[in-house]
Regions:
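Short, charged, surface-exposed secondary-structure boundary motifs
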Residues: 102-107, 159, 203-208
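Phosphate-binding and adjacent anionic-ligand microenvironments
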Residues: 127, 164-248
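Active-site flanking residues adjacent to catalytic metal/cofactor-binding acidic residues
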Residues: 70-73, 131-133, 216
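Glycine- and other small-residue-rich loops at beta-strand/loop junctions that grip anionic moieties
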Residues: 40, 44, 70-73, 105, ...
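Predominant activation on well-ordered alpha-helical scaffold segments within soluble catalytic domains
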Residues: 20, 53-56, 79-86, 114-121, ...
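Gly/Ser/Thr-enriched, mixed-charge loops and adjacent short helices
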Residues: 2-123
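Short hydrophobic/aromatic-enriched beta-strand-loop microsegments
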Residues: 89-96, 147-152, 190-198
């Protein structure tokens, strides 16, 4: 289970520790009544539409000319990615988009890129996009089947942001697990790299502390604070694809 604040951010370690302390305490807790808790929104179809509208609005490109293959990991993206990518002019095909409650992440998605890489090469696609089961992560493969991990996503998107004057603080936030290649890339491109402890929450806290705009992990959690409050695989995919379309 993931709990978010009213501002859309993951809870800090200190807040989670206080909640855990309360739960484990033997002292009786005063429980709030229904009227004090708030209201539940149950419009699932509207929520799905709102989500797709939002993600589509995060880029300006129509992605025309791209041939994309997306792996939905038999998970959350299966319900949203086809309609989302259908909003753009790219040709997009999908694999592993038939969840049955058991096959999520099973030999597919961002943790198993073999099927996607082979299918991209076989089908002559420009790019392959892979989500994980809950679609908060995104990795990609190029036209040769080569893996584009989270560090490479950070590098490509940050360089594009720098060239457009959008890289606030001239900084990428990554973790101590980042590849040395990312460090070398940043040195060569004159970009500052700040590394945090492992975990996208640590990355986000550092980004918010200094108003940095891009950060993430090698595993595919990427955060663009210009458009979101947490990592989202479908947002990441569109941000990367927009750079690809823009570069021709």
């Amino acid at each position: 289970i993931k709990v978010f604040s009213g501002q859309g951010y993951k809870l800090s370690d200190s807040v989670e520790a206080r909640i855990e302390e309360k739960i484990l305490s033997q002292e009786p807790m005063k429980l709030r009544t229904r009227g004090e808790i708030g209201r539940r929104h149950h419009g699932m179809r509207q929520l799905k539409r709102d989500y797709i509208d939002f993600v589509a609005s995060t880029i300006e490109s129509d992605l025309a000319g791209l041939k994309i293959l997306a792996d939905c990991a038999n998970g959350a993206a299966s319900a949203t990615a086809p309609e989302l990518f259908g909003r753009f002019k790219a040709r997009t095909d999908f694999i592993h988009r038939d969840p049955d409650g058991v096959n999520i992440n099973s030999h597919c998605g961002s943790t198993h890129l073999e099927d996607l890489a082979a299918a991209v090469v076989r089908g002559g696609y420009d790019i392959g996009v892979a989500f994980d089961g809950d679609a908060d992560r995104c990795l990609l493969v190029d036209e040769t089947g080569g893996v584009i991990d989270g560090d490479k996503v950070l590098a490509v998107c940050a360089l594009d942001m720098k060239r457009r004057g959008k890289l606030n603080g001239n900084t990428i936030v990554a973790t101590v697990m980042s590849n040395l290649g990312l460090h070398e890339f940043c040195r060569n491109e004159g970009i500052d790299l700040v590394c945090t402890a492992v975990g996208d929450r640590n990355v986000l806290e550092e980004m918010l502390r200094h108003d940095y705009r891009i950060g993430g992990e090698q595993s595919g959690h990427t955060i663009f604070t210009d458009v979101e409050t947490t990592g989202d695989g479908e947002v990441t995919a569109l941000q990367f694809l927009q750079v690809l379309a823009r570069s021709g």
